[in-house]
Curated annotation (Swiss-Prot):
Protein name in the entry: Tabkunin 2
UniProt-annotated location(s): Secreted
Highest taxon listed in the record's lineage: Eukaryota
Coiled-coil portions: none
Domain BPTI/Kunitz inhibitor residues, every copy: 25-75
CDD domains per the UniProt record, alphabetical: Kunitz-type
Source organism of the structure: Tabanus yao (Horsefly)
Length: 76
Protein backbone atom coordinates (compact mmCIF):
# COMPACT_ATOMS: atom_id res chain seq x y z
CA UNK A 1 0.00 0.00 0.00
CA UNK A 2 2.86 2.38 0.78
CA UNK A 3 4.43 1.67 -2.60
CA UNK A 4 1.16 2.46 -4.37
CA UNK A 5 0.84 5.73 -2.46
CA UNK A 6 4.42 6.67 -3.33
CA UNK A 7 3.83 5.92 -7.01
CA UNK A 8 0.69 8.10 -6.95
CA UNK A 9 2.58 11.00 -5.35
CA UNK A 10 5.44 10.76 -7.85
CA UNK A 11 3.00 10.60 -10.77
CA UNK A 12 1.09 13.63 -9.45
CA UNK A 13 4.28 15.68 -9.13
CA UNK A 14 5.37 14.74 -12.65
CA UNK A 15 2.00 15.76 -14.10
CA UNK A 16 2.11 19.05 -12.20
CA UNK A 17 5.58 19.94 -13.50
CA UNK A 18 4.81 18.80 -17.04
CA UNK A 19 1.78 21.06 -17.23
CA UNK A 20 3.48 24.08 -15.64
CA UNK A 21 3.70 26.92 -18.15
CA UNK A 22 6.75 29.13 -18.42
CA UNK A 23 6.13 32.59 -16.85
CA UNK A 24 7.41 34.17 -20.08
CA UNK A 25 4.14 33.07 -21.68
CA UNK A 26 2.11 35.30 -19.35
CA UNK A 27 3.92 38.48 -20.39
CA UNK A 28 1.92 40.83 -22.63
CA UNK A 29 2.72 41.43 -26.30
CA UNK A 30 5.42 44.13 -26.47
CA UNK A 31 6.22 45.60 -29.88
CA UNK A 32 9.27 47.49 -28.60
CA UNK A 33 10.42 51.11 -28.86
CA UNK A 34 12.11 51.10 -32.26
CA UNK A 35 10.65 51.34 -35.73
CA UNK A 36 11.85 48.22 -37.53
CA UNK A 37 9.29 45.66 -38.69
CA UNK A 38 10.32 42.11 -37.80
CA UNK A 39 7.62 39.42 -38.03
CA UNK A 40 7.54 37.59 -34.68
CA UNK A 41 5.19 35.48 -32.56
CA UNK A 42 3.99 35.83 -28.98
CA UNK A 43 1.76 33.73 -26.73
CA UNK A 44 -1.60 35.40 -26.14
CA UNK A 45 -2.66 34.12 -22.71
CA UNK A 46 -6.25 35.31 -23.33
CA UNK A 47 -6.73 33.19 -26.44
CA UNK A 48 -4.34 30.43 -25.34
CA UNK A 49 -2.57 30.53 -28.71
CA UNK A 50 0.60 31.83 -30.29
CA UNK A 51 -0.10 34.78 -32.58
CA UNK A 52 1.88 36.85 -35.06
CA UNK A 53 2.88 40.46 -34.40
CA UNK A 54 5.34 43.02 -35.74
CA UNK A 55 8.34 43.64 -33.46
CA UNK A 56 10.04 47.04 -33.62
CA UNK A 57 13.53 45.65 -33.03
CA UNK A 58 14.46 46.85 -29.53
CA UNK A 59 12.99 46.69 -26.05
CA UNK A 60 9.99 44.48 -25.57
CA UNK A 61 10.05 41.39 -23.38
CA UNK A 62 10.81 37.66 -23.56
CA UNK A 63 7.40 36.72 -24.97
CA UNK A 64 8.88 37.16 -28.43
CA UNK A 65 9.63 34.16 -30.66
CA UNK A 66 11.13 33.92 -34.14
CA UNK A 67 8.89 31.06 -35.24
CA UNK A 68 5.42 29.77 -34.49
CA UNK A 69 6.95 26.39 -33.66
CA UNK A 70 9.27 27.92 -31.05
CA UNK A 71 6.35 29.76 -29.44
CA UNK A 72 4.18 26.64 -29.37
CA UNK A 73 6.99 24.52 -27.90
CA UNK A 74 7.50 26.98 -25.05
CA UNK A 75 3.95 28.07 -24.27
CA UNK A 76 1.16 26.09 -25.93
Amino acid sequence: MKVLSLIFVIFSVLVLFASAKDPVCDQPKAVGRCFAAFPKFYFNSSSGQCEAFIYGGCGGNENNFSTLEECNAKCA
